Amino acid sequence: MEMISYYAIKSSSDLAKERGTYSSYEGSLWSQGIMPLDSVSIVEQQRGEGYIEVDKSMKMDWDALKKKVKTQGMRNSNVMAIAPTATIANITGLTQSIEPTYSNLFVKSNLSGEFTVINMHLVDALKEIDMWDEVMVYDLKNLNGSLEGINRVPEEIKKLFATSFEVEPKWLIESASRRQKWIDQSQSLNLYISDPNGKKLDVMYRMAWLKGLKTTYYLRSRSATTSEKSTITNLELNAVKSAAQAPEAPSACSILDPDCDACQ
C-alpha cells in the first residue's frame, strides 16, 4: 500500500509540472508538504497522547517526495480512496476490494436479477484433495457457504477460506488502520459481527476510532432467526457413500404377445 501511495502522489506531482496544479492547490495540505502519513501526527496533537494507535513505520523516501510536491505541486486534489466493489468483483470472479470472502456459496440479488456466486478458489482446493462433489455442494448450501460445520474438510482449508463472519473484526480494523495512513481520502470498510450486542459494538467502534480510521461503511450482522431447513439431518453422514441398488424395471408385457388386450 505504501508503494501505491508513493507513486500515485509522485505521478500527480509530475502531471502538475507538465499541466499545472489544480485550482485550489495553494494553501492545501499538499502545498504545505503534508502527506497522508503526516496527518496521523496532526490527529494525535488534536486528541492528545494515547488516543491514537497507528503504526507509523515507512520504507520509502517520503522527504524527497515532499520536496517534489512542494516544488511542482499536485495535479489532483484527491488521489486515493478505496471503494466498495461488490458487484464488479462478482462479475470478474474476484473478492470485494479489501473485504474478506462474504460466503463461499450464496445467491446475490440486484436490479438485474439473481445469480449464484461461488468461490472458485475453494472449488480448486477441494478438487485437489478429491472432496469437490455433489455432497460438498449440498453441505455448503445448507451451511450458508461456510466450511465450519463440515468435519471432513481439513482445518488448514477451513482457515484459508474463512468467511467474513468467521474473521474477528479486530483484524479487519487493524488492516484498515495500516492502509489508512497511506490514503488521503478514506476507505469503505464493512464490519461483520455474528452475534451483535451493545458491548461488542462499543468495543469494535472504539477500536476503529483509536486506530485512526476516518470512517466505516456498513455493519453487517447475521439474522437472529433463520428459516429451518427441514430436509437437513446430521451432515456427518453426507460424505458416506450409500450402497444404493439400481431400481428394478417395472414388469411389462411384450408388444408381440397376441393375448395382451392392451396391445391389440
Please annotate each region the language model reported:
Residues 8-12, 65, 179:
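Hydrophobic alpha-helical packing residues
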Residues 34-50:
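Polar, glycine-rich mid-to-C-terminal structural blocks
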Residues 230-264:
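Acidic, low-complexity intrinsically disordered tails
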